[in-house]
From Swiss-Prot:
Superkingdom of source: Archaea
UniProt-listed Gene3D superfamilies: 3.30.420.100
Subunit-level organization: Part of the 50S ribosomal subunit. Contacts the 5S and 23S rRNAs.
Gene: rpl18
Protein name per Swiss-Prot or TrEMBL: Large ribosomal subunit protein uL18
Coiled coil ranges: none
Family: Belongs to the universal ribosomal protein uL18 family.
Keywords, comma-separated and alphabetical: Ribonucleoprotein, Ribosomal protein, RNA-binding, rRNA-binding
GO CC list: cytosolic large ribosomal subunit
Length: 195
């Protein structure tokens, strides 16, 4: 660590690796609320946050655990569940009178088609206006969970590995090969609740 009279200690959140202030300033200068998306090992979190000089105000938070309420039996950290979280977040924002926002992915690397952008796609489909590039969004097949269903079909030849990989799906009574159909059912439940 540097020493001496000219050494300047960085802000605490910068030292802890939590905030990139240059990026935060650009988001705040837009004057729009931020759709903050955070990903954990088994869950997705989406928040609508407004700037306040005393500290950011969280308008609402949608955690992927809320998908249980709609009958979601799949994993809560994958692409289809991320899309559904984004869909709910988009409808909640519109319900509270917010028509536009900017996406805040924090310190995550921007990778084309990942779960963070699945949340963005869900919010866009709900009707929220968020500046984005179409090339960054995941494909419809991946959003529906086709890649998971195809992997399950391929893995079914090895029964032991299949049961180990998809144990939560099987415990919940969901055939992983039927995930795209299950996704559509849950999506329709969400849409019908908000319309």
């Amino acid at each position: 660590m540097a020493h001496g009279p000219r050494y300047r200690v960085p802000f605490r959140r910068r030292r802890e690796g939590k905030t990139v202030y240059r990026k935060r300033l650009k988001l705040l200068l837009s004057g729009k609320p931020r759709l903050v998306v955070r990903r954990f090992n088994s869950n997705i979190l989406a928040q609508l946050v407004e700037y306040d000089p005393k500290g950011d105000r969280v308008i609402f938070t949608i955690h992927s655990n809320v998908l249980k309420k709609y009958g979601w039996k799949g994993h809560r950290g994958n692409l289809p569940s991320a899309y559904l979280v984004g869909l709910i977040a988009g409808y909640e924002a519109l319900k509270r009178g917010y028509k536009e926002a900017v996406l805040d992915i924090g310190r995550y690397k921007s990778t084309k088609g990942n779960a963070l952008y699945a949340v963005l796609k869900g919010a866009l489909d709900a009707g929220l206006n968020i500046p984005h590039s179409e090339t960054i969004l995941p494909s419809e097949d991946r959003i529906r969970g086709e890649h998971i269903a195809n992997y399950a079909k391929m893995l079914k030849e090895n029964e032991e590995l299949y049961k180990k990989q998809f144990s939560r799906y099987l415990k919940e009574g969901l055939d992983p090969e039927q995930l795209p159909n299950h996704f559509e059912e849950v999506k329709q439940k969400i849409i019908s609740q908000y319309q």
